[in-house]
């Protein structure tokens, strides 16, 4: 009986672990679908992109720049023409911001 209980607990733990991994992985895929990839154009800066997307709220712009730098593994806030960045703009709304979207 003790051996059967141990097997049951082990299998139950394995199934729960697999479910948790699946849900967390699926969430990351869905998260990526909520953003757009853009190609940086001549004259673009993170601050200018933040201004186009976030408007007048300075605090939101700082959060935007931090998010973009973190998610795109940018060592500095300097971006160059040709860089491809992921931005936190839902794809269905990206046309509002007149961004050069890379599909």
Swiss-Prot record:
Residue ranges annotated for the LysM domain, each copy included: 36-87
Compartment(s): Cytoplasm
Keywords: Cell cycle, Cell division, Cytoplasm, DNA damage, DNA repair, Septation, SOS response
GO CC annotations on file: cytoplasm
Stored PROSITE patterns: LYSM
InterPro entries: Cell_div_suppressor_YneA, LysM_dom, LysM_dom_sf
Pfam families assigned to the protein according to its UniProt record, in alphabetical order: LysM
Key word Kinase present: no
Single GO BP term: negative regulation of cell division
Task of the protein: Inhibits cell division during the SOS response. Affects a later stage of the cell division protein assembly, after the assembly of the Z ring, by probably suppressing recruitment of FtsL and/or DivIC to the division machinery.
NCBIfam families per record: PRK14125.1 (NF010723)
Family: Belongs to the YneA family.
Protein name, as recorded: Cell division suppressor protein YneA
Organism: Bacillus licheniformis (strain ATCC 14580 / DSM 13 / JCM 2505 / CCUG 7422 / NBRC 12200 / NCIMB 9375 / NCTC 10341 / NRRL NRS-1264 / Gibson 46)
Gene name as annotated: yneA
């Amino acid at each position: 009986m003790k051996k059967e209980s141990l097997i049951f607990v082990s299998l139950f733990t394995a199934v729960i672990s697999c479910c948790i991994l699946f849900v967390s992985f699926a969430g990351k895929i869905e998260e990526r679908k909520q953003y757009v990839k853009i190609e940086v154009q001549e004259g673009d800066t993170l601050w200018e992109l933040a201004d186009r997307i976030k408007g007048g709220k300075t605090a939101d712009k700082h959060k935007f720049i931090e998010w973009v730098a973190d998610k795109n593994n940018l060592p500095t806030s300097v971006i160059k023409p040709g860089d491809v960045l992921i931005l936190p703009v839902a794809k269905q709304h990206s046309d509002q911001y007149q961004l050069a979207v890379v599909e």
